[in-house]
Amino acid sequence: MINLLESIDFYIQKGYEDAYATAKVAQDIILSKIANSNYRNNITVKGGVVMFNITKDKRRATVDIDIDLIRYSLEDKSILLLFDKLNQIDDGIKIVVNKKIKQLKHQDYQGKRVNIILKDSFRNQIETKIDIGVHKNLDIKQEEYMFNFEVFNDSMTLLINTKEQIFVEKLSSMLKHGIRTTRYKDIYDFYYLITEGNMDKSLLIKLINIYCINNISRINTTSDIVNELSRIFNNPNFLENVQNSRYNWIGENTNIVLNTILDFIKQLEPLVV
């Protein structure tokens, strides 16, 4: 049987900060329940959890759990049914769901936030939240990824957003928010994906057309993307924040990071139609 406090201490001993150790335990439990359920092909994992797993870098650890539903309803009753089924997985952990599910509506995202409590048989409990959206474009294929759940000493496969989709969704969000963006860590995610991600450029171009060029009114070419990013990157407030060390999880010079991003988008220009 899993002891939540012992599991948290396990990750602390491996070098995680307390909050991230607690979050990692919650992520392991929730994702392993999904992997062991009939919903494993109806859910794709996204966001910081994926970035942390593909980078294998504790500096990119996250407290968030973000998933998208595939061919499954986002209605509250459907979400509650999903968690009810996950609760039937016999792993010694019970999920208590706050039934006041919050509607999330942002410029580039609509979904639901579910606050949950995980309880073990030793009367320990931890809280976490899960943001749930919908994977609407079924033509955008998801990738199978092997997660290592150290709490269970096991590995299991789940669907995740591809690196290319992660990159372009972050890019689309930044273009939509412009200089008002607060997603400074995304800058360093871009750099990692460009330099280490070995992205498929043909897929990247396809997604840039879907998410950016065909979806944002003022963006018609990659030149428009470069110009908008340059405007953002030269904004004094943005520069001050993005240089904060708590966002720079890769430890690279910020000017090098920003120039690498711009150069990468520029060299895609002849390929985007």
What are the language-model segments listed below?
Residues 45-49:
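Glycine-rich beta-strand-to-loop/alpha-helix junction loops that act as flexible
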Residues 1-43, 53-61, 65, 69-273:
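Structured mid-to-C-terminal alpha-helical surface segments
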